[in-house]
């Protein structure tokens, strides 16, 4: 159970609770056990109003407490505690973390293999069948779930969470407060090959990938995402970057601080993406280009050249009835003949 007082402390890491001083001692002691939407929440749950579309549900909510803006706080039922904040959705994000399920295992599992030269910090959890290579360093309070592999000479910062089946290649550097979800691969060999005179007969000459992957602090990487090591220079992921599931980041890519990347996006080698960019799902970005700061790419956009001006860019074709699409395709081909 989490008290209102504890919720306030968590929220105020990001923004103030504007009516904190007006809450009674009894209200501050109120305990909650979870989060629900305005319609379904019960007396032991917290809810929030982030979108005015759901305002009609506020008056009849049974939630024990509601995160609300100043504009709408008078519409909260009298028996529900109103926590007034500037951005309810951000407050909801903050408190969701303390309601999340905690790790059930702590310590080092007896089946884990840890090289003698590895340096393991204080209060580190290492799950079953993990493999920790030579000269690896793992920071304090980090958690490795089952079957994680960390190859030689890799460093992981403090307070990391590494889910099952993650593989981190040799010589990589992972910052603090990083979350790597199941099946993530960091530091795989980049896709680098030189053609021979006749690849169909003599094949392709493999280029050894000699760089590393460097990941900053407060980074979140979703399941089954692959980030390849650099060919010569490093692949670099900045601070506060969030990456969804099933994203491919090729060798030598550099991603700026605070950028968000949705699922199924592919970023080809040696491309640089600036700070605070938002990249939608299934975006394709060609190699050896630069994208400036504060660029938004809508879903399925194909980027084939550098973007030097901040703003929103799109290239995907929206769905339409098939007959209409066929007529539009004919006209599009005709435009190419002009």
Swiss-Prot record:
Enzyme Commission code: 2.3.1.191
GO cellular component term of the entry, any: membrane
GO molecular function: N-acyltransferase activity
Signal peptide: none
Similarity-based family: Belongs to the transferase hexapeptide repeat family. LpxD subfamily.
NCBIfam families for this protein: lipid_A_lpxD (TIGR01853), PRK00892.1 (NF002060)
Protein name from the UniProt record: UDP-3-O-acylglucosamine N-acyltransferase
Organism the protein comes from: Psychrobacter cryohalolentis (strain ATCC BAA-1226 / DSM 17306 / VKM B-2378 / K5)
């Amino acid at each position: 159970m989490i008290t209102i007082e504890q919720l306030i402390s968590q929220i105020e890491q990001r923004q103030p609770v504007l009516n904190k001083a007006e809450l009674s001692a009894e209200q501050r002691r109120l305990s909650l056990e979870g989060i629900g939407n305005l319609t379904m929440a019960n007396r032991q749950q917290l809810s929030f109003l982030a979108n005015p579309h759901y305002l009609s549900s506020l008056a009849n909510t049974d939630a024990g407490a509601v995160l609300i803006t100043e504009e709408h706080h008078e519409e909260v039922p009298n028996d529900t505690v109103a926590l007034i904040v500037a951005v309810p959705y951000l407050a909801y994000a903050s408190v969701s973390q303390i309601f999340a399920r905690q790790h059930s295992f702590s310590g080092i599992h007896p089946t884990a293999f840890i090289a003698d030269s590895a340096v393991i910090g204080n209060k580190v959890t290492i799950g079953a069948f993990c493999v920790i290579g030579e000269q690896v360093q793992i920071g304090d309070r980090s958690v490795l779930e089952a079957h994680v592999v960390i190859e030689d000479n890799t460093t992981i910062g403090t307070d990391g969470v590494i889910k099952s089946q993650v593989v981190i290649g040799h010589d990589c550097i992972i910052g603090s407060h990083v979350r790597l979800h199941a099946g993530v691969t960091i530091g795989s060999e980049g896709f680098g090959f030189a053609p021979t005179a006749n690849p169909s007969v003599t094949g392709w000459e493999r280029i050894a990938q000699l760089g590393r992957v460097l990941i900053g602090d407060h980074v979140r990487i979703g399941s089954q995402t692959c980030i390849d090591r650099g060919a010569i220079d490093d692949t670099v992921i900045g601070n506060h970057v969030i990456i969804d599931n099933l994203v491919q980041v090729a060798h030598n890519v550099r991603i700026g601080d605070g950028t968000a990347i949705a699922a199924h996006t592919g970023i080809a080698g040696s491309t640089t993406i600036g700070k605070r960019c938002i990249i939608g799902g299934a975006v394709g970005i060609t190699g050896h280009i630069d994208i400036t700061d504060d660029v938004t790419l809508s879903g399925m956009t194909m980027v084939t050249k550098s973007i030097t001006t901040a703003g929103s860019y799109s290239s995907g074709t929206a769905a339409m009835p098939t007959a209409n699409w066929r007529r539009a395709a004919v006209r599009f081909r005709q435009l190419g003949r002009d």
